[in-house]
Amino acid sequence: MSNSNPVAIITGAAGNLGQAVATHLGSLGYRLLLIDLHQPDWEGESDAVSIGNVDLTLPEHAQEVVNQAWEYFGQIDAVVNIAGGFVWERQAESSLDTWNTQYAMNVQTSVNMCQAILPQFQDQQGGLIVNIGAAAASKAADGMGAYAAAKSAVLRLTEALAAENKHLGIRANAVLPSILDTPANREAMPDADPADWVSPYSLAGVIAFLLSDAARDINGAGIPVTGRV
């Protein structure tokens, strides 16, 4: 696949990680479609289109994202599925609503975007997908049952996509971060040392690597990005 002015769809683009990924990919010359429930801000120099009020738990919204990307740019080379969410809740105080919400926010959003983009990638026999899993996908910690289960499903989705489409030149990988250094996490954990956490810009660099030709032989992987946690 040519890396000349590639086009990437970034979901969850209004959040800290989404902004970091957009900035990094934009600096590499990517043209970007930035998607979120809220209107993503973009001040970079790259060619970018921002669209808010997109609910990726709805398949029709995901399909419209793909349609819009094709209309704006005439090609799609990569999808970075960042849209998601986290709830800390111990099981004794939890409810099925929490599990359903975590599934919708983390799994449905990724599934719907992958379902929407796969026909295009299969037709062009090439495409790159990076999903955001979590270190908790392999082992849940205190209060993270629903979140860990959802992120484990994202990792399994990634593995299946890679296995099913590798003969078509489609690569799917996931990154598995621990705690991201964001204002919300600093507020929630004031006694922790954020120097041990994962910088969104560092994680953006890993995502950019997975989208590059240097990672052409990496497929179906879950890449731990855990800082010093």
Segments predicted by a language model, with ranges:
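Residue(s) in the substrate-gating loop at a strand-loop-helix junction
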Residues: A134
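Active-site loop-to-helix junction immediately N-terminal to the catalytic Tyr of the SDR YXXXK motif
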Residues: S94, A140-A148, A160, N185
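Alpha-helical segment proximal to the catalytic Tyr-Lys
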Residues: P119, A163-E164, R216
